[in-house]
Curated annotation (Swiss-Prot):
Residues 176-178 are annotated as: G5. Residues 19-26 are annotated as: G1. Its main location: cytoplasm. Residues 10-206 form the tr-type G domain. The gene is tuf. It is an enzyme of class 3 (hydrolase). Mg(2+) binds at residue 26. It holds the Pfam family GTP_EFTU_D2. This is Elongation factor Tu. Monomer. Residues 83-86 are annotated as: G3. It is found in: Cytoplasm.
Length: 397
């Protein structure tokens, strides 16, 4: 069967739902597809709750993690939407998922207000650089008291302001995902209002299309008879089929190959552009030669490194960080783009220890090379838990 060609007529934006478990992230995602399907049936297939809920599964640390990718269109834009799992255990995936967002819909149940995972997701969104947030105050049909709704809204705004989002100015839309899903016209209207807020408050991202191509690899699989496919979100540049690429990072040696095909949502593309989630077919590359954490680049435009200087913020105990200080030769994992690599920390002269809540500079030596450049962001993690966030300030080797 010939693959349908992807029409690139509208601007493309990556968004996702974040928030506490059971506040209605998946229901809202399903409701968005239903309401948009009812408005523009020719543009949007409806994705029922069950279909999103049984998202493709990924295993991490023995926990089964699912992340659903849904696509839909408003009149203005084409969206790729990730429904992030809500569990605190799934934060690893949130880091990979949230890293793919130009903006997020923070779902908060009006019946509960902000909960621990709400805070955690907002903190994480800030760390991984989700630039814009729109709030869906869900289950608003279940709260009759206007004052209570206003109070919850205020709480959410304060939480966002505390994490350096413009809490006073960003849109908070009262919705009922369930009622909209059941076809209630009033609540369907509220959902359209939410999507208008997303259209207007999450700016068209400045794409990095002018820069040389780079895509971090998230997943690798084999397609029988066609070869090895790597998937991920193109970070910058443009790649066309039959162009040469280089695979850099994790391994000692970089590999050169040719990209023989590009696809998105099972449709063939004539190019991969910065900001898009794509699959790249690589010629003559074995599955075992590629792994998550490598990057696909325009040959010669990025180099693997193991030693760097960085400026970091270590989370306080209240933010879910360490309870105790760390010392010279601390060995956590450094999470770059899509993967964790262990590294050894050297503290600056005169610094004996770093307390939770501190800002510091450090020198890090990784046990595996990572394609890096100055200003690249990373998370510092221990056993899957984020304990700090940083940026590369200088590459040593």
């Amino acid at each position: 069967m010939a693959k349908a060609k992807f029409e690139r007529t509208k601007p493309h934006v990556n968004i996702g739902t974040i928030g506490h478990i059971d506040h209605g992230k998946t229901t809202l995602t399903a409701a968005i597809t239903k309401v948009l399907h009812d408005q523009h049936p020719d543009l949007n297939p409806y994705m029922p709750f069950d279909e999103i809920d049984k998202a493709p599964e990924e295993k991490a640390r023995g926990i089964t993690i699912s992340i659903a990718h849904v696509e839909y269109q408003t009149e203005a834009r084409h969206y790729a939407h990730v429904d992030c799992p809500g569990h605190a255990d799934y934060i690893k995936n949130m880091i990979t998922g949230a890293a793919q967002m130009d903006g997020a819909i923070l779902v908060v149940a009006a019946t509960d207000g902000p909960m621990p995972q709400t805070r955690e997701h907002v903190l994480l969104a800030r760390q991984v650089g989700v630039p814009y947030i729109v709030v869906a105050l869900n289950k608003s049909d279940m709260v009759d008291d206007e004052e209570l709704l206003e109070l919850v809204e205020l709480e959410v705004r304060e939480l966002l302001s505390s994490q350096e989002y413009p809490g006073d100015d960003l849109p908070v839309v009262r919705v009922s995902a369930l009622k909209a899903l059941e076809g209630d016209p009033e609540w369907a209207g509220k959902l359209m209002e939410l999507m208008t807020a997303v259209d207007t408050s999450i700016p068209q991202p400045e794409r990095e299309t002018e820069k040389p191509f780079l895509m971090p690899i998230e997943d690798v699989f084999t397609i029988t008879g066609r070869g090895t496919v790597v998937t991920g979100r193109a970070e910058r540049g443009i790649l066309k089929p039959n162009e040469e690429v280089e695979l850099v990072g994790i391994r000692e040696k970089s590999t050169k190959t040719t990209c023989t095909g590009i696809e998105m949502f099972r449709k063939l593309l004539d190019e991969a552009r910065a900001g898009e989630n794509v699959g790249l077919l690589l010629r003559g590359v074995k599955r075992e030669d590629v792994e998550r954490g490598m990057v696909v680049i325009k040959p010669g435009t990025a180099t693997p490194h193991t030693e760097f200087e960085a400026t970091v913020y270590i989370l306080s105990k209240e933010e879910g960080g360490r309870h105790t200080p760390f010392f010279q030769n601390y060995r956590p994992q450094f999470y770059f783009r899509t993967t964790d690599v262990t590294g050894v920390v050297t503290l600056p002269e005169g610094t004996e220890m770093v307390m939770p809540g501190d800002n510091t500079t450090m020198t890090v030596k990784l046990i595996q090379p990572i394609a890096m450049e100055e200003n690249l962001k990373f998370a510092i993690r221990e056993g899957g838990r984020t304990v700090g966030a940083g940026r590369v300030t200088k590459i040593i080797k």
